[in-house]
């Protein structure tokens, strides 16, 4: 493996695995650097905590200077600063994993000289630094050389190692024309040569965009994050008013409420948990996509994936394997099934096509395993004969198009056994391909070739249906074939004989009904639909236009990945919702846990509400502040990993999360604050 490939592989492992010491150390450093208030203004909850922490620090310093008791003020200040640092740490850890991967990707960039073609007629070239190449210029790349920048192959065909980008060490074929002409800077030509036209300036290549996406330089808040931030700001204002109104009851009851105590109480009541973890949840969602080798251009794309209502899936490669495979051999009347299977096998022994190999595999599964006899003559398939087979010692075996084999055997339609005619018609109606088989000039059966639905696809679609998603299969097949495959795969609907314009129209129709649409594509003709879709997943091996149109890029070029993308998006939304539920439930519980403890001395009637029996008003406040800080640390792993996702209906999911995180959020403060209070009082801290 070359050096760039090793660096890229290390970056992927950094994301796929846990936190390295280097990532954690950098995250801790950045958590303190983010104490700069200019970086906190976008998070009203944590910014409010920063302000109160600063006031608490001033109060503690004033107490020390004035030789007043300062222990309580110092502890409050320390734990309030810890709350801000822990919130910053959550975001820094999430960003740190992406930055580690970005550093590894950056290491894959090589400084190389390109062979710039200056005379197309003679092929004369001059060495030119890669960063000086301009869009539209043509360069030559030969075996063993690194492709210096992104481009489109205009001449030649080569085997290219794309491990530096995709992590897949097996070389792939890239050639001019079609959808396999795009090449990426940083990959290596293994064999042959190509001439390519440069499509990206230095600094805007696919690798540069990967690094920018991973680092999150353009990570703007998503609409849901903005809405949640507004909600948190509103709750912060409500609790500020609630704390200020305590001055009245305090004065009435003769309790002198220290501004430091009120400030600390205010911070314990506002939703600091979700406020501190909100950014981490969004960043971690993008990182989880990167773990499955998918790059998202923004958090908006990930969020949209979680809200998708309609999923458009290409049949070939996504729902089916894309290769016709033998599924059965139907014997002619009077022919034993094993004899028909053996004839089909003999006719396929010299066939190197996927169809021929599938017939051999079908026979092997039936207990037949033969090799081509020594001295046998292979009869290749031609466009004229439309059949292939094997000859050996005067015997012959053939398979091919039904009408071609019938014609070779001199059979008229009326002389074909009814059973075989019915079988041929059934296979054709179901979208399959019938192949007739003959042995020594006698018709012995029919092979059923079909585009096989991938294992587990039907179950995945059932899961998506339970999630409330509508699946639509897109295919160029005729409606009869499309209906048969759609029924077998379990999709909700299909679009047959589809053109790129049909895809675009369908997306607009779905969006017109208020639905969010996801689709994947790789061809230049998919670009309009990818751009129109709310979630457009382009294949890395696809055309440049497709990659630029989509808001996600699948480095593995696996169309089925769109299902995982939707699941990651939903997991991110569920995690955010669960932590929000837990945080708000926490605030409500802390309000009823702390307020009675603060006033129970002056208002004994509140003793009935003081269920926790905290040691003193000071220990109640200090314990709540400590709990408030520690709960952020405790939930960082959940924010990064995400709440475990299950493919169930929205109602069940809501009920489960309310029970687990809502009820848990109500109970946790009572248990946590009481335990901390016992420690605080035992150590004489308050």
From Swiss-Prot:
EC number: 7.2.2.6
Active-site residues per Swiss-Prot or TrEMBL entry: 314 (4-aspartylphosphate intermediate)
Catalytic activity: K(+)(out) + ATP + H2O = K(+)(in) + ADP + phosphate + H(+)
Biological classification of the source: Bacteria, Pseudomonadati, Pseudomonadota, Alphaproteobacteria, Caulobacterales
Keyword Translocase applies: yes
UniProt-annotated binding residues for Mg(2+): 522, 526
Binding site for ATP: 351, 355, 381-388, 399
Membrane-related topology note: Multi-pass membrane protein
GO MF: ATP binding; ATP hydrolysis activity; magnesium ion binding; P-type potassium transmembrane transporter activity
Membrane-spanning intervals of the chain: 45-65, 70-90, 226-246, 261-281, 592-612, 620-640, 660-680
Pfam families (UniProt xref): E1-E2_ATPase, Hydrolase
Location relative to the cell: Cell inner membrane
Keywords: ATP-binding, Cell inner membrane, Cell membrane, Ion transport, Magnesium, Membrane, Metal-binding, Nucleotide-binding, Phosphoprotein, Potassium, Potassium transport, Translocase, Transmembrane, Transmembrane helix, Transport
Gene3D superfamilies for this protein: Calcium-transporting ATPase, cytoplasmic domain N, Calcium-transporting ATPase, cytoplasmic transduction domain A, HAD superfamily/HAD-like
Highest taxon, organism lineage: Bacteria
Family label: Belongs to the cation transport ATPase (P-type) (TC 3.A.3) family. Type IA subfamily.
Protein's job: Part of the high-affinity ATP-driven potassium transport (or Kdp) system, which catalyzes the hydrolysis of ATP coupled with the electrogenic transport of potassium into the cytoplasm. This subunit is responsible for energy coupling to the transport system and for the release of the potassium ions to the cytoplasm.
Name the UniProt record assigns to this protein: Potassium-transporting ATPase ATP-binding subunit
Cellular compartments per GO CC: plasma membrane
Subunit structure: The system is composed of three essential subunits: KdpA, KdpB and KdpC.
Keyword Nuclease attributed: no
């Amino acid at each position: 493996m070359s050096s760039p490939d090793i660096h890229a592989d290390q970056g992927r492992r950094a994301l796929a695995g846990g936190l390295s010491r280097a990532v954690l150390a950098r995250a801790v450093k950045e958590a303190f650097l983010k104490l700069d208030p200019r970086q906190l203004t976008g998070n009203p909850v944590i910014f409010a905590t920063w302000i109160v922490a600063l006031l608490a620090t001033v109060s503690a310093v004033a107490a020390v200077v004035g030789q007043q008791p300062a222990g309580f003020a110092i502890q409050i200040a320390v734990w309030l600063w810890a709350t801000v640092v822990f919130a910053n740490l959550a975001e820094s850890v999430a960003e740190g994993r992406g930055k580690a991967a970005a550093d590894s990707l950056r290491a894959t960039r090589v400084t190389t000289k390109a062979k710039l073609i200056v005379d197309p007629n003679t092929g004369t070239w001059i060495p030119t630094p890669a960063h000086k190449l301009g869009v539209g210029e043509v360069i030559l790349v030969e075996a063993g050389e690194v492709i210096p920048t992104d481009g489109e192959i205009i001449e030649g065909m080569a085997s290219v190692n794309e491990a530096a980008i995709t992590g897949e060490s097996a070389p792939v074929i890239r050639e001019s024309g079609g959808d396999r002409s795009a090449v990426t800077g940083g990959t290596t030509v293994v064999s042959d040569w190509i001439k390519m036209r440069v499509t990206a300036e230095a600094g805007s290549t696919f690798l540069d965009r990967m690094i920018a996406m991973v680092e999150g330089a353009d990570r703007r808040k998503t609409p849901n994050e903005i809405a949640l931030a507004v909600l948190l700001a509103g709750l912060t204002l409500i609790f500020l008013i609630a704390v200020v109104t305590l001055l009245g009851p305090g004065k009435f009851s003769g309790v002198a409420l220290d501004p430091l105590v009120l400030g600390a109480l205010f911070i314990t009541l506002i939703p600091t948990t979700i406020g501190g973890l909100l950014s981490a949840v969004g960043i971690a969602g993008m990182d989880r996509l990167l773990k499955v080798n998918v790059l998202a251009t923004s958090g908006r794309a990930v969020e949209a994936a979680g809200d998708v209502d309609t999923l458009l899936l290409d049949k070939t490669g996504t729902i089916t394997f894309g290769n016709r495979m033998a599924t059965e051999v139907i014997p002619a009347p009077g022919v034993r099934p094993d004899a028909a299977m053996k004839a089909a096998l003999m006719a396929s022994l010299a066939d190197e096509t996927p169809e021929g190999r599938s017939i051999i595999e079908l026979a092997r599964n039936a207990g037949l395993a033969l090799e081509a006899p020594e001295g046998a003559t292979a009869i290749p398939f031609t466009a004229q004969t439309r059949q292939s087979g094997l000859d050996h010692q005067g015997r012959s075996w053939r398979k091919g198009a039904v009408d071609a084999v019938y014609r070779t055997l001199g059979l008229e339609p009326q002389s074909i056994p009814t059973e075989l005619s019915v079988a041929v018609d059934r296979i054709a109606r179901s979208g399959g391909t019938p192949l007739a088989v003959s042995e020594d000039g006698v018709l012995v059966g029919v092979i059923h070739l079909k585009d096989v639905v991938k294992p587990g696809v039907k179950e995945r679609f059932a899961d998506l249906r339970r999630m409330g998603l509508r699946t639509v299969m897109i295919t160029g097949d005729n409606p009869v074939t499309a209906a048969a495959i759609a029924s077998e795969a379990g999709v909700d609907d299909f679009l047959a004989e589809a053109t790129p314009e049909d895809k675009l129209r369908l997306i607009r129709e779905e969006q017109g009904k208020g639905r969010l649409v996801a689709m994947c594509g790789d061809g230049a003709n998919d670009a309009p639909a990818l751009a129109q879709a709310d979630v457009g997943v382009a294949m890395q091996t696809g055309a440049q236009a497709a990659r630029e149109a989509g808001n996600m890029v699948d480095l593995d070029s696996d169309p089925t990945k769109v299902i995982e993308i939707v699941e990651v998006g939903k997991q991110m939304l569920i995690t955010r919702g669960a932590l929000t539920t837990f945080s708000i439930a926490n605030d409500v519980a802390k309000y009823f846990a702390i307020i009675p403890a603060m006033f129970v001395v002056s208002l004994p009637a509140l003793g009935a509400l003081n269920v926790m029996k905290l040691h003193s008003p000071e220990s109640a406040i200090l314990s709540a502040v400590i709990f408030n800080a520690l709960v952020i640390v405790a939930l960082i792993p959940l924010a990064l990993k995400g709440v475990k996702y299950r493919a169930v209906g929205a109602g069940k999911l809501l009920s489960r999360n309310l029970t687990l995180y809502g009820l848990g959020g109500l109970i946790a403060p009572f248990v946590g604050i009481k335990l901390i209070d016992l420690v605080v009082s035992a150590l004489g801290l308050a």
